[in-house]
């Protein structure tokens, strides 16, 4: 049998449920709590950094992220009963929500999370309830008493001018018969005046003259009939009852605010419009002009209680949740005086390292809230401590006789020298040459000649500690409010800052407080109808081409361009490009378009059995050019919003027991989208009952949460280079049930439930914390703990001579293993797994704790919970060629496996072979012959050998990393024997 050696080039292929014989190199049977990375390999996922308990969060709530910018990030929750709560995502502090009207609470009442949707457009946060049927309002344009008017167009002598009302009563005036003297000049005012006087003499009618026009109505306001004849031509006198057939027939002088309909074609009312008279001098009657208006008595508004509501951030930092009606807008608060706005901050004490210019952080403490600071300059802090040979800190030279050497007739003893480093009475390292010793950011070096102290040979040492990245200048990026001068605030690393000056300022509230769902101001129910969503629920709220977009059933409705709150036309005389769009999608099956993604081709709309594209084939998007075209008829679960991963879109199709995840690429509106099932190699891996799916494009990571496994996030990561993609599926097991998660760029925010507490945490997917964390060979590495805290509260008890290292309020969880990590440079990397302790009498935030000996209130610690990462490899087969073909007939016998790692801490390898006990090999990641006390147990590049001695398909091989340190597996080499019995494969 031939000895062979083969390499598995990486382990980032993710989980595959295909038979091991069909798996590609790099694919795994299982992968939990690892994060595949093309640069680093299979890395242990970052830990969750605990932010805060979310005060007053409720069970079974519906959560949404509101990320306005880097400074203002919020997490909101609606209870099923409609109550709203808001917290800062940066600090976890609950924000003030002003009193909410009962109708707004009712609007947000819901039974399942998918019934609610939010949409953030700059300063607006819209809230949609998909179950609420939109209704027309009750505000109607003012009714108008039936009236008519008669216009005297020409005057003539010897003529009769007759007005007949209700086909029965006539009023006439006869002009003089001649123009010979002494007859006066004929004037239209005489005709108008005499006819008005004649009509007003009848108790049933009222008339008024203005210019050459006579206004007529019934005294009791009832309707009536009107006609007029006279003059010496057919058009000498004309009568109109409430409407005209041409704008040319409108009088040049009339009474202010009276309305007349201008009729279009006789067989349709769709081209009619209404006009209102405006006097030039704003008096009650006179010359003026006509402008387009709303018909009398027409309902103008939408019922705001049934329309989407809005969350508004007020000037004083509070939030208002309300309906968008006229009364609320006009009654909203105007400018308000905000006090305690921070204008200057000074550094009080900055000792932590690892900070970088541009780093931003929330300032904790003080009387106010929402203060954020930025690092503008950093410096390096260097401190040295020297000690003499006869002190408790020294280097000791030991020698051991190892033999003799002979030179000529001289024989001399040969010694091996070792150098033992002692600091404050504790051995911290051993080396063979006495060269300076580096532990963390401290360098220990000999500072004098060796001398005999007792029976030892010693020299003094100097310990030089260099802390890089100490904050030396800061600026304010978010001033906050409610602070007072002399307030002390801090960052999470324990650096402190003093607020030196504050001021007060009158600030306007958010502009959205002045907006409301606009009224219909033009036309009538036929010419300017209610939007097609009236009478039905709104299924989706989105944004496209500077318009708010609603969908309702198969209809797509867009607001006016630039006027997000207006769904009525600005004129009915012509079609204006900025007017609303209201079109219907043509489908064979009923459809509800519940999700949308903006694409270069248009607005991609998703229904449960079809995908549509709202677009235009011209440059301008308008009522005349807008189209909704069918792209595909792929089936999907419409409870879960599809996501945009940059070059394509991902959506979910749920089965009874498992879910399928599809990717769809849209190239143009004339080409059918290409669809690929991403879960084809693992058909039963993703559970059904999906509740949320989110994506981080910057980290190339998709995450899915299911009701069936509430502690687990299923993730898909991809790396795209041109047309080539490396991708894989894997699972993250969270410390407790996940209530909510979302991405903000490469930051994952997670809310987990621990007992009755809801805890907000964050995870940085691409970079480790640039301060506070462990320093390894000049690189900061975060601890691999969940709910970890780099600056826990420390309380010393002199009676027990113990220091309590406390978990934050709400972070206690007896189902998890607490870990205490020491961060001081001389002991960095030392950690203890302890039992969680409880003191009911302690202050809030100090009730749950771990302990260390002595008074260590000035020492640095990290505290958190242990989590385990594990990956199981498939069976080992001989790979015959570069294409990955496996010889599944002739199974090799594996002698040993060599695991290559990078920047990795301790881990263990487990071999489960048929017919023998499990073999577990602990790999501590400590270099031989180089002892550094309490040094971080991480090796930059390492290869560990695990003995196997089993056939490639008769054992399981699993890698487990449960230490609080980073672990990254780059590749696998295996050695063994292989015999193909002389048969050559074709």
Whereabouts are the PLM-identified features?
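Beta-sheet repeat architectures centered on beta-propellers
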Residues: 2-61, 65-73, 657-986
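Threonine/glycine-rich low-complexity segments that form extended coil/beta-edge repetitive scaffolds
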Residues: 58-68, 73-75, 82-84, 94, ...
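Conserved, function-critical positions that sit in or immediately flank catalytic
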Residues: 283-288, 292-510
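Loop/turn residues immediately N-terminal
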Residues: 80-85, 131-133, 213-214, 547, ...
């Amino acid at each position: 049998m031939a000895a062979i050696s083969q390499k598995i080039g990486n382990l980032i292929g993710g989980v595959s449920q295909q038979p091991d014989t069909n798996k590609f190199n790099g694919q795994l049977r299982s992968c939990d709590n690892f994060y595949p990375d093309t640069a680093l390999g299979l890395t242990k996922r970052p830990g969750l950094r605990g932010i805060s308990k979310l005060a007053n969060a409720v069970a079974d709530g519906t959560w949404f992220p509101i990320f306005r910018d880097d400074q203002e990030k919020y997490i909101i929750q609606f209870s099923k009963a409609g109550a709203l709560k808001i917290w800062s995502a940066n600090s976890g502090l609950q924000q003030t929500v002003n009193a909410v009207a009962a109708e707004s609470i009712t609007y947000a009442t819901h039974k399942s999370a998918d019934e609610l949707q939010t949409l953030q457009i700059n300063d607006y946060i819209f809230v949609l309830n998909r179950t609420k049927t939109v209704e027309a309002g009750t505000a109607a344009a003012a009714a108008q008493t039936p009236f008519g008017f008669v216009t005297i167009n020409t005057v003539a002598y010897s003529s009769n001018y007759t007005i007949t009302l209700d086909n029965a009563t006539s009023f006439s005036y006869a002009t003089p018969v001649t123009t010979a003297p002494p007859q006066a000049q004929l004037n239209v005012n005489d005709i108008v005046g005499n006819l008005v006087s004649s009509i007003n003499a009848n108790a049933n009618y009222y008339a008024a003259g203005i210019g050459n026009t006579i206004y007529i109505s019934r005294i009791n306001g009832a309707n009536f009939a009107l006609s007029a004849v006279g003059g010496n031509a057919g058009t000498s006198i004309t009568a109109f009852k409430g409407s005209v057939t041409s704008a040319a027939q409108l009088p040049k002088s009339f009474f202010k605010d009276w309305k007349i309909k201008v009729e279009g074609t006789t067989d349709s009312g769709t081209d009619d419009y209404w006009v209102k008279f405006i006097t030039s001098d704003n008096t009650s009657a006179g010359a003026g002009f006509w402008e387009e208006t709303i018909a009398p008595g027409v309902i103008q508004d939408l019922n705001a209680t049934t329309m989407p509501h809005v969350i508004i951030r007020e000037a004083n930092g509070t939030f208002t949740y309300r309906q968008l009606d006229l009364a609320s807008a006009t009654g909203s608060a105007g400018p308000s005086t905000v006090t305690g706005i921070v204008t200057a901050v000074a550094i009080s004490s900055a000792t932590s390292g690892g900070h970088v210019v541009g780093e931003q952080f929330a300032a904790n403490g003080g009387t106010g809230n929402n203060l954020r600071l930025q690092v503008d300059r950093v410096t390096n802090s260097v401190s040295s401590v020297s000690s003499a040979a006869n002190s408790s800190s020294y280097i000791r030279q030991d020698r051991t006789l190892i033999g003799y050497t002979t030179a000529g007739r001289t024989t001399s003893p040969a010694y091996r020298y070792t150098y033992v480093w002692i600091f404050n009475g504790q051995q911290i390292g051993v080396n063979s040459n006495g060269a300076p010793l580096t532990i963390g950011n401290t360098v220990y070096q000999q500072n004098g000649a060796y001398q005999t102290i007792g029976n030892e040979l010693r020299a003094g040492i100097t310990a030089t500690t260099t802390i890089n990245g100490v904050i030396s200048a800061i600026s304010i990026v978010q001033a906050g409010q409610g602070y007072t001068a002399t307030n002390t605030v801090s960052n999470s690393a324990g650096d402190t800052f003093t607020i030196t000056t504050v001021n007060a300022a009158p600030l306007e509230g958010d502009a959205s407080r002045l907006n409301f769902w606009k009224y219909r101001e033009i036309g009538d129910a036929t010419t300017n109808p209610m939007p097609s969503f009236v009478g039905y629920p709104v299924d989706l709220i989105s944004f496209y081409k500077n318009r708010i977009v609603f969908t309702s059933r198969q209809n797509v409705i867009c607001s006016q361009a630039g006027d997000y709150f207006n769904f009525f036309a600005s004129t009915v005389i012509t079609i204006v490009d900025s007017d609303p769009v209201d079109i219907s999608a043509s489908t064979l099956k009923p459809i509800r378009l519940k999700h949308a993604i903006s694409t270069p081709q248009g607005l991609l709309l998703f229904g449960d059995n079809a995908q549509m594209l709202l677009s235009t084939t011209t440059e301008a998007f308008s009522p005349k050019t807008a189209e909704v075209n069918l792209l595909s008829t792929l089936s999907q679960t419409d409870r879960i919003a599809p996501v945009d991963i940059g070059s394509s879109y991902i959506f979910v199709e749920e089965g009874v027991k498992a879910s399928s995840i599809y990717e769809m690429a849209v190239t143009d509106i004339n080409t059918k989208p290409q669809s690929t099932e991403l879960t084809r190699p693992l058909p039963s891996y993703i559970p059904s009952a999906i509740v949320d799916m989110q994506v981080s494009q910057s980290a190339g990571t998709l995450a899915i949460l299911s009701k069936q496994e509430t502690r687990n996030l299923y993730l898909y990561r991809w790396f795209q280079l041109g047309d080539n993609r490396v991708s894989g599926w894997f699972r993250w097991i969270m410390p407790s049930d996940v209530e909510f998660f979302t991405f903000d760029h490469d930051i994952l925010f997670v809310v987990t439930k621990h007992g009755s507490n809801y805890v907000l945490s964050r995870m940085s997917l691409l970079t480790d914390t640039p301060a506070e964390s462990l320093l390894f060979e000049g690189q900061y590495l975060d601890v691999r703990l969940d709910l970890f805290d780099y600056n826990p509260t420390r309380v010393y008890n002199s009676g027990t001579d113990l220091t309590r290292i406390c978990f934050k309020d709400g972070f206690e969880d007896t189902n998890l293993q607490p870990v205490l990590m020491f961060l001081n440079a001389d002991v960095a990397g030392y950690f203890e797994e302890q039992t969680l302790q409880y003191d009911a009498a302690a202050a809030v935030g100090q009730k749950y704790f771990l302990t260390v000996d002595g008074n260590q209130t000035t020492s640095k610690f990290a505290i958190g919970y242990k989590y385990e990462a594990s990956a199981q490899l498939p069976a080992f087969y001989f790979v015959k060629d570069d294409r990955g073909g496996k010889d599944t007939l002739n199974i090799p016998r594996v002698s040993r496996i060599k695991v290559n790692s990078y920047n990795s801490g301790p881990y263990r390898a487990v071999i489960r072979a048929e017919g023998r006990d499990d073999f577990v090999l602990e790999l501590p990641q400590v270099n031989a012959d180089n002892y550094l006390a309490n040094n971080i147990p991480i090796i930059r590049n390492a290869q560990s050998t695990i003995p196997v001695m089993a056939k490639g398909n008769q054992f399981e091989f699993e890698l487990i990393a449960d230490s609080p340190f980073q672990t990254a597996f780059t590749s696998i080499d295996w050695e063994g024997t292989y015999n193909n019995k002389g048969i050559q494969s074709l």
